[in-house]
Amino acid sequence: MINSDNQKFSEIRFDWERDEILEILNYPLIDLMWEAQIIHRRFNQYKVQLASLFSVKTGGCEENCSYCSQSIYSSSQIKSHPQFEVEAVLNRAKTAKKEGADRFCMGWAWREIRDGKPFNSMIEMVKGVKELGMEACVTAGMLTDEQALKLADAGLTAYNHNLDTSPEYYKNIITTRTYQDRLETIKRVRNAGINVCCGGIIGLGEDNGDRASLLEVLSNMNPHPESVPINSLVAIEGTGLEGGKEIDSIEMIRMIATARILMPKSKIRLSAGRENLTKEAQILCFQCGANSIFYGDELLTTSNPSFQDDRKLLKDVGVLFNKDFEYCDKTVSTV
């Protein structure tokens, strides 16, 4: 049982070990949530960032990620489409802002960023989103040092590149890109001065040891990732994991709480699979550390709760969101 008077979690650390993370992950749930909530209140207000995610280029990806319907190895019925034009993407960003989002995330189904017109358009999209007064995030696979610097010059807020799972379990999920490839991409992003957005997926068939190992890699990054998306598998027909079972909501709550304890200042983003969580489960995730969600009716290729439902949920709970709303002006006391 956690002793609230000890100093075990009083400092931000970058030297977590797998065994101690696994111990935290397996704490009695009430104790785990309580400790995570204390840390959440200490380092963050109860404010939830609303991030909108848009697929700029869908399908045709050369990677063989077994959970993804955008892979050329998938037999899913997803409709591929070429890259949207800059104006169309910025119009979508304007709509997202009107609906309450303050971060606009743009996704390309690529193994790596492609130079020439596609990359030039990406730069214009980043600049346009920033001109709207929004944070701009890109996820587009691997990138070069030069590309990272150009994105930084364009004002990119964050670059997303998830680790997906533990180093040990990774080969069961994807074989066309190594774990080290992912770490090198994150290093290039960080060296360019761009915030790192990096998380993973639970429900891929991994065990708690793998989840602890994933969190070990994330929490030992110095500094910690600016944002950490925690996804649960959405099993899509035609993918390698189409028969995957829906995880119990308690597993997501444990993952969110542990991530908050390990990375006190990061945005812990409740991401894909949230539609499968009950309202009560989402509330518990907010209570123990989630402070960002993807906002809007769909993600890249999966559905998501409607923005009307999300705004009602956040207001009913008393969670703050988006600085542009008067509702966010009230302060939250700390304990």
UniProtKB/Swiss-Prot annotation:
It holds the Pfam family BATS. [2Fe-2S] cluster binds at residues 105, 137, 197, 269. The keyword DNA-binding does not apply. Its cofactor is [4Fe-4S] cluster; [2Fe-2S] cluster. GO terms for molecular function: 2 iron, 2 sulfur cluster binding; 4 iron, 4 sulfur cluster binding; biotin synthase activity; iron ion binding. Binds 1 [4Fe-4S] cluster. The cluster is coordinated with 3 cysteines and an exchangeable S-adenosyl-L-methionine. [4Fe-4S] cluster binds at residues 61, 65, 68. Its EC number is 2.8.1.6. Keywords: 2Fe-2S, 4Fe-4S, Biotin biosynthesis, Iron, Iron-sulfur, Metal-binding, S-adenosyl-L-methionine, Transferase. Pathway: Cofactor biosynthesis; biotin biosynthesis; biotin from 7,8-diaminononanoate: step 2/2. It is an enzyme of class 2 (transferase). GO terms for biological process: biotin biosynthetic process. PROSITE patterns: RADICAL_SAM (PS51918). Residues 46-274 form the Radical SAM core domain. It catalyses: (4R,5S)-dethiobiotin + (sulfur carrier)-SH + 2 reduced [2Fe-2S]-[ferredoxin] + 2 S-adenosyl-L-methionine = (sulfur carrier)-H + biotin + 2 5'-deoxyadenosine + 2 L-methionine + 2 oxidized [2Fe-2S]-[ferredoxin]. Belongs to the radical SAM superfamily. Biotin synthase family. Catalyzes the conversion of dethiobiotin (DTB) to biotin by the insertion of a sulfur atom into dethiobiotin via a radical-based mechanism. Homodimer. NCBIfam families: bioB. This is Biotin synthase. The gene is bioB.
